[in-house]
Amino acid sequence: MRFGWWENTVVRNLDYREAWAAAMRRTVDVEEDIGCEPALSVVRMGDTTAATASIAQIPVRSNARGWELTAHPSLESRRVDGAWREIRDLAEELVIGRTQRLMVHVEGPWSFGANVEYRGHALLRDRPAFRDCAVTLGEAVAEAAQWWSEAMGSAGNPAEVIIAVHEPRVAEVASGLSGSTDFDTFDPVDRQILAGVWERFASQVQRPMVLNTHGPLDDGVVDAVGASEWEAVVVAPEQLQSSAAKDRIGQLIGTGQRIGWALGSVEVTAGIEGGESTAVKMLNQWRQWSFEEAMLPRMVDVVVPEGVRTKGEASEAAAAARIAVSSLVKG
């Protein structure tokens, strides 16, 4: 399944109505031919952990280190719930009929378990509690995706919904998560267990999913990716700086895994020139891997990396991604 490109952008200093309008100008109301239907990202809030907890109706409250489970909804939980209601209401007003493909961004179970505390420790430390939350999360994301599909589609033609799973802390989980104190440590999680939790999540959600770890993929995470199923896995620019890292990604592609090529720090701010530069880099690297050039547009999407941006910065980054994909599609 091709996506062409997608963005991992939180736009600051915009209300949700403006954010929806700007997102459609970046994604839907464009001239570039990317060879497939673009995926419009559902407007995001600044904190993915809190937004994901709200989707799952898991009550949390903030503490000095981040978030912790609570027995009853906190003021922060209610505020995020209200934001989601506004985002959905505006989508029904502004988005219906404009696109048939949407991307919903959520935090993955491993990073959620690392970012949320339970009884003073990372949720991961309590296996039954982590399992219950992970299962609840999977069920809730499935329900949310169903709502977006039905609400944004038309009679007999539901919208396609892709789930962008953000796992910024999975590398820490795989290598041994640090606790709230020097004496609070968490053993490394085996790659098969990593993959197993992802597979259970996927079986619940039943939607195309893309994985974003917000950084390089080490051996353990790559093995877990290979043992699970993702439509695409985001590859950070720094992942392609060493021969060993390039080989690791090349081997992953060789197994049939599609990747999302994240724009570099220079290209993401350079608009059209950044897109043209990215297309050249992608083609050169593809040739180094010795894959057939005709496979490149089918196996690689372009991704705007995770970031908080102004409306102008978001537009520049999206333009770079669209130009890169369009250049590759045109050959």
Listing of model-derived features with the role each one plays in the protein:
Residues T136, A140-S243, D247-R248:
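Active-site loop segments of alpha/beta catalytic cores
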Residues E7-L14, E107, E167, L211-L217, ...:
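Structural motif
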Residues E231-G331:
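Catalytic-face loop-and-helix region of soluble metabolic enzyme cores
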Residues Y16-A23, R79-L90, R131-A144, D187-F201, ...:
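Well-ordered, non-membrane alpha-helical segments in soluble/globular domains
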Residues M1-E107, S111-D126, F130, A227-E229, ...:
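Alpha/beta catalytic barrel-like cores
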Residues G120-C133, A164-D187, G215, G264-I272, ...:
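Active-site-proximal beta-alpha loop/turn segments in soluble metabolic enzymes
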Residues I96, S203, I253-G254:
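Anion (oxyanion) recognition and catalysis
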Residues V104, V141, V302:
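Conserved, mostly hydrophobic/aromatic
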